[in-house]
C-alpha cells in the first residue's frame, strides 16, 4: 500500500514538472498596469487592447531578475499593443505599430544602466505579440521586442 502511495506521489511530481499549472490570480504591484488583483482566464483568442499575464521572454528573464525589475518567476501584466500581421518598428527611442508612434524608450534606467534596444522593423508572425505597459517606465516590449504566444499565460481581468 505504501508503495502505491509513493508511486502516485512520484507521478504527481513528474506531472507537475511537465505540466506547470498556470496562475489563476495575479496581484500586480507594478505601476506599469493598474494596481490590484487580476483573475487569469485561459488564453483563448488574444486581441489588440487585451490585458494579458505573460512571462518575460526567456532571453530577458534572468537579466530582468538580476536588475531587480521583476523576479524571474513573476509574470508581467501588460496590454496587447500589436497582434500577428502588424508591423512593429523600434527606431531610436520611438516604437511604432503600423507606422504610428505608440511608445518612447528610455536609453537608461533610473540607475543610469543601459536599457536593451532591439531595433528595426518586423511584421509579427502568427504567434507573436507586442506587449506594452501603460506607464512610461514599464519594462516591456519596447525593450525586449515581440513576445511569443507560448509566454502568454492568459487574459487578465482586474477584480
In which residue ranges do the predicted regions lie?
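Short, surface-exposed secondary-structure boundary micro-motifs
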Residues: 43, 57, 93, 100, ...
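Structural motif
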Residues: 37, 50-52, 86-87, 94, 128, 134, ...
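Acidic/glycine-rich C-terminal interaction modules and beta/coil loop segments
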Residues: 105-156
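Protein maturation boundaries and topogenic segments
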Residues: 1-75, 123, 144-159
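Mid-length scaffold segments of soluble, non-membrane domains
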Residues: 71-104
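Solvent-exposed loop/turn segments at secondary-structure junctions
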Residues: 44, 88, 95, 137-138
Amino acid at each position: 500500500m505504501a508503495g502505491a502511495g509513493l508511486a502516485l506521489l512520484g507521478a504527481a511530481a513528474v506531472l507537475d514538472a511537465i505540466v506547470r499549472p498556470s496562475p489563476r490570480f495575479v496581484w500586480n504591484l507594478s505601476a506599469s498596469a493598474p494596481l490590484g488583483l487580476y483573475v487569469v482566464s485561459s488564453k483563448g483568442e488574444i486581441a489588440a487592447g487585451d490585458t494579458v499575464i505573460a512571462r518575460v521572454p526567456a532571453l530577458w528573464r534572468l537579466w530582468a531578475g538580476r536588475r531587480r525589475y521583476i523576479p524571474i518567476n513573476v509574470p508581467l501584466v501588460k496590454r496587447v499593443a500589436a497582434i500577428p500581421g502588424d508591423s512593429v518598428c523600434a527606431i531610436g527611442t520611438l516604437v511604432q505599430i503600423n507606422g504610428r508612434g505608440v511608445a518612447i524608450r528610455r536609453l537608461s534606467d533610473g540607475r543610469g544602466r543601459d536599457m536593451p534596444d532591439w531595433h528595426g522593423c518586423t511584421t509579427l508572425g502568427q504567434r507573436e505579440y507586442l506587449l506594452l505597459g501603460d506607464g512610461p517606465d514599464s519594462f516591456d516590449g519596447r525593450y525586449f521586442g515581440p513576445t511569443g504566444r507560448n509566454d502568454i499565460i492568459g487574459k487578465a481581468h482586474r477584480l
